[in-house]
Regions:
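N-terminal glycine-/serine-/threonine-rich phosphate-binding loop
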Residues: 1-76
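Structural motif
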Residues: 2-5, 31-34, 63-66, 79-81, ...
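Short, basic/aromatic-enriched C-terminal tail that caps enzymatic domains
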Residues: 3, 262-275
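Fold-independent oxyanion-binding glycine-rich loops
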Residues: 8-10, 36, 68-71, 85, ...
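Active-site histidine-anchored catalytic micro-motif
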Residues: 27-30, 45-47, 60-62, 67-69, ...
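Anionic-ligand-binding alpha/beta catalytic cores of soluble enzymes and soluble regulatory domains
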Residues: 119-195
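A conserved acidic, glycine/proline-rich C-terminal tail/linker
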Residues: 184-264
Length: 275
């Protein structure tokens, strides 16, 4: 069974997600359809880029990932299909694949050119469905598009290493269900830049002196228990390999979250400063 994943900003109130799945099944009944998320903030390509980069590796090679966020084809934005790390991604060329392509060079990218082959009134997602089902059946990328070598990158998804390697400047690119704030700074980038040096994590007027291996890594000496640390700020490299600012056992209605207690917002600056 071929797998097609869906990541959109459609939400679940309306008919859009159900209709999208119906179109996929109509074209390829054998497809296995998996929802990654339909609650991406509207038109937020940074958030979508992080979500897909964090999720894709959980799926088998050959999976087709459809990304329906800010996907309208216009004078500035084309539709593309990319083969990358033996996975396939179908989306708009709006920078949404920036996090992936800074890690590994794509195997092949095509600009989709089948629009004139579809019925009049076909939507952007109709194009994506046709391309995704074609790929899922084993179809070649060259059949549905013209090969290209470059795609758009979004600068806010790229952390900046200082010229003297004394610091890394990043930004909050995603705030999760727990209110934890994920940055665009990866563990690999920190280790490669640190070369054995210790570092502080700074944002606003606050500093975190170390990165924990897991959320519950606290000193339990004396009479302290894990519950005593509820509400404490911490930094961790999350399971996707990105630096995350969090509150231990965060809860918006009780102890608060990194977003509410630390004042962090989408796009806020977070620095790694080497000692």
């Amino acid at each position: 069974m071929s797998i097609i994943t869906l990541t959109t900003d459609f939400g679940l109130k309306d008919h859009f997600v159900g209709a999208l799945k119906g179109k996929i099944i109509s074209q390829y009944p054998e497809a296995g359809i998996i929802d990654i998320s339909h609650h991406v903030d509207l038109f937020n390509i940074s958030e979508a880029s992080y979500i897909i980069s964090a999720a894709y590796s959980s799926f088998p090679k050959g999976t087709v990932h459809v990304i329906g966020v800010d996907c309208e084809q216009n004078a500035e934005t084309r539709h593309i299909a990319m083969q990358w790390n033996d996975h396939y991604f179908v989306c708009a060329d709006n920078g949404i694949l920036s996090i992936l392509t800074q890690k590994i060079v794509p195997q092949k990218i095509v600009e989709i050119n089948i629009h004139d082959r579809l019925p009049g009134g076909a939507t952007d997602m109709d194009v994506f469905v046709t391309v995704a089902t074609h790929i899922a059946r084993g179809g070649l990328l060259n059949v549905i598009g013209k090969e290209i070598t470059e795609i758009k990158n979004v600068s806010e998804l790229q952390p900046i290493v200082a010229s003297d390697k004394a610091s890394i400047k990043g930004n909050v690119i995603y705030i999760d269900h727990f209110g934890n704030c994920v940055t665009n700074i990866t563990e690999k980038l920190v280790k490669d830049t640190a070369r054995g040096r210790d570092f502080d994590i700074t944002f606003s007027t606050k500093t975190i002196k170390s990165v924990k291996a897991q959320y519950s890594e606290w000193n339990l000496s004396g009479n302290y228990t894990l519950k005593d640390y509820e509400g404490e700020k911490l930094a961790i490299f999350n399971e996707a390999g990105f630096l995350e600012i969090a509150i231990y056992r965060s809860n918006p209605s009780t102890v608060g979250t990194a977003k509410t207690l630390l004042g962090l917002k989408f796009r806020d600056v977070v620095n790694v400063v080497f000692r």
